[in-house]
Amino acid sequence: MKKVKVCSPGTSANLGPGYDIFGLALSKPYDILEVEKTEKGIIISVEGEKAEEIPTNVDENTAGVVAKKMMEDFNIQSGIHIHINKGIKPGSGLGSSSASCAGVAFALNELFELKLSKLELVKYSSLGEAVAAGAPHADNVAPAIFGGFTLTTSYDPLEVLHIPVDIEVLVALPNIQVSTKTAREILPKEIPIKYMVNNVGKAAGMVYALYNNDLELFGRYMSKDCVVEPCRANLIDGYAEVKEKVKDLVYGITISGSGPAIITIPKKEHVIDIENIFKEVWNCPVYYTKVGPGCYVEEIE
């Protein structure tokens, strides 16, 4: 095997009360990564969404950091060329950096037949997230690897729970810049216990709703975060207006990851109405998609 081509999905993390725990893999948008064996070194090339803003230096690129660590750990002597076709806009709140991290970990596992488990791939992938967010975290890379709905319940040791689900979502991507680091820094270091009780209860209710295929309950609890969303809402102009306008058209709405992307669980009969509101307020791209698989191989040479 000389070359592998991998599809790595966009993801939505947090989902309201599940901060740094919950994640969903999306069928679109997605990145395509091609990893090819070379004689030596790691070369990175990028095309697609905001490609000119993505560093190709190995130690500054999320995929590069992951690849370097894996190649060191497994004493891989050959070089590689990583080509990333970005379909996920960086800084969107849809797991753009995570797609690169997970995609390259998955590709190297295939290319060099490392036989790593999905959990081990999540662990390696999360290391690259430190470049984008300042610290390793797995709430995006876990669904990018596992697909479906994931819960990262522990970091030391790393534990990920996976639930296959069939949910349609409607995502808006406002043309607003939100820094992941800034969005994390503005969060409170301590919260009242009543807020903890609310979020734990709502997060538990969301898992219950998934097992009972109850979209109404899932969406209602997704919209009830009282810790993270209130802090980040002001970073997204128009969010309060949109939330009010779509409240009767969706089962739930919240900020995707750090934002600015907004994820909704739409009532099917109102999808077009919601899209029109998104475009009226933000004039932005909209994705009507569903929860999808994790990384998968498209081609092998």
Swiss-Prot record:
GO terms under biological process: threonine biosynthetic process
PROSITE patterns per UniProt: GHMP_KINASES_ATP (PS00627)
Top-rank taxon, per record: Archaea
Enzyme Commission number(s): 2.7.1.39
Chain residues that bind ATP: K89, P90, G91, S92, G93, L94, G95, S96, S97, S98, A99
Pathway: Amino-acid biosynthesis; L-threonine biosynthesis; L-threonine from L-aspartate: step 4/5
Major site of localization recorded for this protein: cytoplasm
Protein name: Homoserine kinase
Annotated organism of origin: Methanococcus maripaludis (strain C5 / ATCC BAA-1333)
Gene assigned in the entry: thrB
